[in-house]
């Protein structure tokens, strides 16, 4: 028996033809799911197969062609819904926040240098529509508009660039700034790194965000292969190194055991003189450096050759092995300063520095 129009119109759960139709099938034996011109579309779950019936205003079944038309429309709606669901992306950022996009990001503002380098390494440079003021690598990125970053982040500048996503560091922006961005429809994704494993996590996160999972995995594999090769070559090399992140004039800062710099030292067969300190980054004194007497000094201060000259001439440092033997290295291209895919290059530079001078071995690359 065909359900009458009057019987179905009294139902409260009237829903449009589309995704909700499937849900309705599971809840009702028969239901009203839409009003095509001149008739009503019903389904009847009590039949052996789901049976669609269109009844016109006089209560008579309408043509099979019209039924076929509505079936086709239903299939289109269902396929569209499935495609939208398949293209949606959900990531959990490195601050534990779940972020969902309807599709991979195509317009992104990146606030910190390391994340920009990750984006470029996985082939997403064209998606960058804005950059923080310290984002300067690769050189081709310098044509991208700059926005204020850190405590002075200008939300209006960012919104004017119409990004889908802002990628930032957990220490860089305030909760209020994040709230403003999200209230204006911009997704905020937080990336924060201190050791090599967290760099891998950031690469994976950003790769998923951009729909570039395979490219992200390839970057990680390349880094791991380089690290493994250098570590194998460095077996038995037992020297110590001091990483200077902030120069004496601003207060000495160095790297502890939970930092990627400590891991770079280990990869190259060296001991970080502050490996007994758990913090990734820590304030240190001249007395501590002198007492621990490093064989090598690596500067990540951004002061160039002037920084090397200043360290070599420091009063009271003359008995340090690295000073006596003039084994002070400056990170000219900042690859050691940034937890990005270029840590691979940092490991190569460090290996080449200590081995070309110390052991005369062939460079790593």
Language model segments and positions:
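Gram-positive cell-envelope targeting signals
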Residues: 1-85
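Bacterial Sec-exported substrate-binding components of ABC uptake systems
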Residues: 51-66, 71, 78-114, 213-243, ...
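Structured C-terminal subdomain patch of bacterial secreted/periplasmic proteins
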Residues: 85, 107, 153, 198-201, ...
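His/Asp/Glu-enriched short active-site or ligand-binding loop at hydrolase and phosphoryl-transfer sites
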Residues: 132, 257-281, 330
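Flexible loop/hinge segments that line or gate small-molecule binding clefts
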Residues: 134-140, 172-205, 209
